[in-house]
């Protein structure tokens, strides 16, 4: 999924546009090239370097988020933003008068992008020393923590939207709505802080994770003879799949540069990534049913049948409300993947997962 949609390319574009707004003397393409080179160099130096850099970025992001929430809370006490009445607090979370099923599912198709990182953890399974169970625990914890933080951040931002009606009607094509709420809450300095922090997080931290996880996926598939063998080459010094890292970097750079020249580049790329995630998760849920219920006759029907079926139904509902262009390209990519799978079966290179038993 991530290989087909190149989330790093979108991260480069979003970060470059944000930094160009802050430092206009450097063009968008210059920022894209700079972010691509920096993240590639860091990843080439190995997973320890990548983990160290992302850890520092995580600390910085949490400090900025804490600053935003703290300043926002103080601004509410001073009377800026919405009045903290019971109705206001409730409407900031959910407004029954304006919420429809199509609106919710359409929003979910975009919001999925914010949570794709948690499944990227699984790409580093071979470099984890704690076993498969630790990978699953890490994914669940990451999803719950980021979800809680996102809810808190979004709730606070909702209370500082200057013109909610216009925002709902026109959307946010420039991607500045959150920074506008920071300006209302704390002034230009808070808007600049959140904008630069977001841009650097996208351009470096998020891109690092996208690049490293996608390169590991390419490496594993090449090692299992499902992709060209050169992608399985590992650097003897740094123990990284060097060719896979460089290929992902090149494709992400190209995609970022192409989309930067489109007025709807960010929106289109977001839709493509999200629809790719949706279809990928549909296939994943289907695989769970096939592996446990059909192949191994599992009796744990709630875990291995009902839960995946519910997930498939919800994901299909979200996909129906996705961008039309994203639907077409996403289905085309899914069809291409199915074709590749047929070729692999026909040539005796059937995909397999080492260590998979009948139960989980």
Locate predicted features.
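Hydrophobic, membrane-embedded alpha-helices of multi-pass small-molecule transporters
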Residues: 31-38, 71, 75, 92-160, ...
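Hydrophobic alpha-helical segments and their helix-loop junctions in multi-pass secondary transporters
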Residues: 2-4, 60-92, 112, 156-161, ...
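TM-loop-TM module centered on a large, flexible mid-protein loop between adjacent transmembrane helices
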Residues: 1-10, 90-94, 138-208, 227-273
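Helix-loop-helix connectors at the membrane interface of multi-pass transporters/channels
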Residues: 1-27, 59, 64-67, 125-132, ...
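C-terminal membrane-solvent junction of multi-pass transporters and transport-like membrane proteins
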Residues: 24-27, 39, 231-238, 278-328
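Transmembrane helix-loop boundary segments of multi-pass membrane transporters
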Residues: 1-2, 8-25, 48-58, 194-198, ...
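A generic transmembrane alpha-helix motif of multi-pass inner-membrane proteins
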Residues: 71, 75, 271-277, 302-360
